[in-house]
Amino acid sequence: MQDGCRPVVAIVDDDEAVRESLRFLLDVAGYDVVTFDSAQDYLDGIDRRRAVCLVVDQHMPNTTGLELLAKLRRLGTGLPTALITGSPTPDILRQAVALGVMKVLEKPLVDDALLRFLAAAAAGDGA
């Protein structure tokens, strides 16, 4: 945790129901959550130094989750990231590994897998 505060998780997903569901789950689990409805919204609005990790949807209009991560990597941001997708194709998995994604989570999400990722990211554990 940072400065004794609750860890901050950034969520980027174009589906409002998913964002709000994740916000509720993570709030109950002890995280502060900031949500964004697009990759551009995230790039424009987040103080990336505050978040301990990023949860990003792959399939969004205009910019996919992997495209957002590629932009962030070019900017030198190595924030621990989980990519969520309903179709984890071999190509998506390959690209995710190349971009340093810590975890690819398949929809529908399993809460325990997401919470394990968040705990590892908040602890600074690359596992």
Model-identified regions with their sequence ranges:
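The feature encodes the CheY-like receiver
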Residues: 19, 61
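C-terminal output helix
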Residues: 91, 109-119
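Charged docking surfaces used in two-component/phosphorelay signaling
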Residues: 20-28
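Active-site beta3 strand of CheY-like receiver
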Residues: 49-56
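The short loop immediately C-terminal to the conserved phospho-acceptor aspartate in CheY-like receiver
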Residues: 15, 58-59
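Acidic catalytic/metal-coordinating carboxylates
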Residues: 37-38, 64-67
